[in-house]
Regions:
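Structured binding/interaction patches within domain cores
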Residues: 1-131, 145
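Charge-dense, extended regions
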Residues: 121-125, 129-165
Length: 165
């Protein structure tokens, strides 16, 4: 599974808009820092190790996205689902870019179903959240709408956002 710049750009934009929906401040700050790190990893000359990204998703210290997802009873689980799936996809991409042959089990299982789960969760979130729709309406998706990969996975979602404006 390969990603292109437009696809990753869209994932970034959609996911960053979910941070405000996380209730506990500690979790919100951790996710924001993690997303910034993920963005840095996508830069052309990035020296960020895929293992560092993966440790933000899952680690033995239990200060990671998957643990917070389990512990947080206030935040909509769909928000956490999107964030965890985004991070798994970014980790997968980072490992692929590095040429790593052996992946952590969680990352090894990343496939098109991960993308589909992300899109499905996001659709459910925008169905019930006008504030999120307004935030997304302010973003310019025009430059990436003609990308076949973006259209394949996100065409319906982007149409829903447009219709709700």
């Amino acid at each position: 599974m390969k990603f292109n710049g437009s696809f990753l750009y869209l994932l970034q934009k959609l996911t960053f808009n979910l941070v405000d929906l996380i209730s506990p401040l500690e979790y919100k700050e951790f996710v924001l820092d993690s997303l910034k790190l993920a963005n840095q990893s996508l830069e052309q000359d990035s020296k960020i190790c895929p293992d560092l990204l993966y440790s933000r998703l899952e680690n033995v210290d239990e200060k990671d996205i998957l643990t917070f997802m389990e512990l947080d009873k206030e935040t909509n689980p769909l928000v956490w689902s999107c964030i965890a799936n985004y991070f798994a996809l970014i980790c997968y991409h980072s490992y692929q870019q590095s040429g790593e042959k052996y992946l952590p089990q969680t990352i090894e299982s990343v496939d098109e179903g991960t993308i589909e789960a992300y899109v499905s969760s996001y659709k459910q979130l925008i169905a019930d959240n006008n504030q999120l729709v307004q935030q997304l309406s302010a973003l310019d998706f025009e430059p990436i709408l003609n990308d076949p990969l973006v259209d394949n996975y996100f065409g319906d979602l982007l149409q829903e956002i447009k219709l709700k404006q």
